[in-house]
Amino acid sequence: MNLQKFPRHPLTFGPTPIQPLKRLSQHLGGKVELYAKREDCNSGLAFGGNKTRKLEYLIPEAIAGGYDTLVSIGGIQSNQTRQVAAVAAHLGLKCVLVQENWVNYSDAVYDRVGNIEMSRILGADVRLDAAGFDIGIRPSWEQAMADVKQAGGKPFPIPAGCSEHPYGGLGFVGFAEEVRQQEKELGFRFDYIVVCSVTGSTQAGMVVGFAADGRARRVIGIDASATPEKTHAQILRIAQSTADLVELGQDITAEDVVLDTRYGGPEYGLPNEGTLEAIRLCARQEGMLTDPVYEGKSMHGMIERVRNGEFPAGSKVLYAHLGGVPALNAYSFLFRNG
């Protein structure tokens, strides 16, 4: 496997810490050891997150090509767009963000706090669009790029989640390599890795990276899209193309993409009672915050898999905390009583 042939522009602090979740592990019976890899603490750029790791492999192309405007898309409370806005500010580039109405959630401040507030503070041109949720290429995003061109700019396209970019999976191939190095220092290997999946390139990169040591199927994706067939297909497609890019030397099959579909409901961006219970439990056991859109759902999935005995006794499970906490303010009504 050859990740080193791809240029990388550092946007993160370096390897993210691995934190033992001792109290949560004991609360859930003590038979499974839980750990968290803190991608939510990976950068000083507007709280960072998993997209910042991905952007390290996209940005060299933008710089080398003389692009002057980063153009991205997401929901109103997109973490992706906030991270793109931060990177643009850091590099002295312009930024146009399309924020679509991906979530059927009504709150008076939903489009004024959290991620979108930060994007505006960072100087991005934020454009609200009424279109609903979809993980594919969006007409509104294509129109934003056309607008930049018409105004004389040179737009660099960054799709939702970085996932449709050919290099979107590379950052999390690097994540797997980073974990392997940390495992040497820890003196043990993780038996399972739990990660939230929506647009797919985070899990896809992990599948490729961990396939190098035989653990592709130990990457447990927890679907938060509530459109799991589309998400599974996109993860597989991205993983296969990423495997070719990094010269993995083995095929990635549909069976290598493990996606647990039980925790994504009722729909994208809307938590269920299990999501909210998991957010509170993790916060009160570990002081670690998760969000109702992504990490609360993957935390719920991990907790239930432990409770149900789906991880064998003695397993060491690594939870990939991808970020997402800046969206909490947009859901303040749900937590008005804690």
From Swiss-Prot:
GO process annotations (BP): 1-aminocyclopropane-1-carboxylate metabolic process; amine catabolic process
InterPro entries in the cross-refs: ACCD_DCysDesulf, ACP_carboxylate_deaminase, ACP_carboxylate_deaminase_bac, TrpB-like_PALP, TrpB-like_PALP_sf
GO MF terms held by the record: 1-aminocyclopropane-1-carboxylate deaminase activity; D-cysteine desulfhydrase activity; pyridoxal phosphate binding
Presence of keyword DNA repair: no
Positions of the catalytic residues: 78 (nucleophile)
Keyword Hydrolase: yes
List of residues that carry N6-(pyridoxal phosphate)lysine: 51
Pfam families: PALP (PF00291)
Keywords assigned: Hydrolase, Pyridoxal phosphate
EC number annotated for this UniProt entry: 3.5.99.7
Signal peptide residues on this chain, from the entry's feature table: none
Cofactor entry: pyridoxal 5'-phosphate
Leading EC class: hydrolase
Reaction catalysis annotation: 1-aminocyclopropane-1-carboxylate + H2O = 2-oxobutanoate + NH4(+)
Subunit text: Homotrimer.
Similarity remark: Belongs to the ACC deaminase/D-cysteine desulfhydrase family.
Main function: Catalyzes a cyclopropane ring-opening reaction, the irreversible conversion of 1-aminocyclopropane-1-carboxylate (ACC) to ammonia and alpha-ketobutyrate. Allows growth on ACC as a nitrogen source.
UniProt name for this protein: 1-aminocyclopropane-1-carboxylate deaminase
Native source species: Acidovorax ebreus (strain TPSY)
